[in-house]
Design a protein with these regions (language model features):
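A short, contiguous structural element within a folded domain that forms the immediate neighborhood
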Residues: 115-141
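Short acidic N-proximal helix/loop "leader" segments that mark the beginning
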Residues: 1-14, 51-53
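Surface-exposed recognition segments
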Residues: 136-217
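A short linear-motif detector with a strong N-terminal bias
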Residues: 1-2, 50-51, 131-132, 174-180
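Short, solvent-exposed coil/turn segments
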Residues: 8-10, 15, 64, 137, ...
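Active-site microenvironments of metalloenzymes and redox enzymes
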Residues: 16-114, 204-213, 217
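Extended hydrophobic/Leu-rich segments
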Residues: 5, 66, 105, 121, ...
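Short, solvent-exposed secondary-structure boundary motifs
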Residues: 1-6, 61-66, 132-134
Length: 217
């Protein structure tokens, strides 16, 4: 498995079927706070998001608190501002890309000794992934990545924004199948507490940034 890392030191995985790298996790509050602090962005929208979904420490969350690690209630334009800060090539995925990532992660099994450890991934990313991998029923990349039983992720469907994902029912009851269903907000500009995002990076950046690439498995 080929991992590269963004400027917040969170991992992306190469998804060859659609020629992108994809964030292994939805974007966390830790990452978004770094963006606000370094870019000097407006903190008020972030406070609105926190009111919908309060934070939890990366090294102390329980199974029932997983969703509190991640940015939710965000709007597509705000997610794109974060993508621009991360650097060239970063973007919200298209519907086709997201579903290809889902299929890729579903095919990938985690080894018994998970490769996601604080030694390999220092900082919050390693803490979060180690605890996620240790949670019950999270023995596949699809589960650890929270593409299953996680959030609804913003994606681009032609000229409109829709959501893909199926949160765990304890967080938000639903019967969605992200491979066949899309989730559409009722009102434009509505902050939805179960909507988050992950990004893709288009282009073979991992070939140009070899110092930020690791093979694990």
């Amino acid at each position: 498995m080929l991992l590269s890392f963004d400027r917040t030191n969170f991992p992306l995985i190469a998804v060859e079927d659609v020629g992108v790298e994809a964030h292994l996790l939805p974007i966390t509050k830790v990452q978004f706070e770094q963006f606000i602090n370094e870019s000097g962005g407006d903190k008020l929208p972030y406070l609105d998001m926190l009111a919908l979904n309060p934070p939890v420490a990366p090294d102390k969350f329980t199974f029932e608190e997983i969703e509190r690690l991640f940015i939710t209630g965000i709007l597509p334009d705000e997610a794109l501002a974060f993508a621009g800060w991360l650097g060239d090539g970063f973007d919200l995925p298209t519907l086709t890309e997201w579903r290809a990532i889902y299929h890729t992660f579903r095919r990938a099994a985690l080894p018994i000794d998970t490769p996601f450890s604080p030694d390999l991934l220092p900082g919050p990313a390693g803490l979060i992934l180690t605890r996620l991998a240790a949670q019950a029923h999270r023995h596949s990349l699809l589960d650890v990545s929270l593409m299953r039983s996680g959030l609804v992720d913003w994606v681009r469907d032609n000229k409109q924004w829709v959501g893909l994902g199926a949160p765990r029912p304890e967080f938000h009851p639903n019967l969605w199948d992200p491979l066949t269903n899309t989730v559409k907000p009722i009102h434009a500009g509505e902050r939805i507490p179960y909507f988050g995002f992950r990004l893709v990076r288009r282009g073979e950046w991992y070939l140009a940034e070899k110092e930020r690439v690791r093979y694990v498995g």
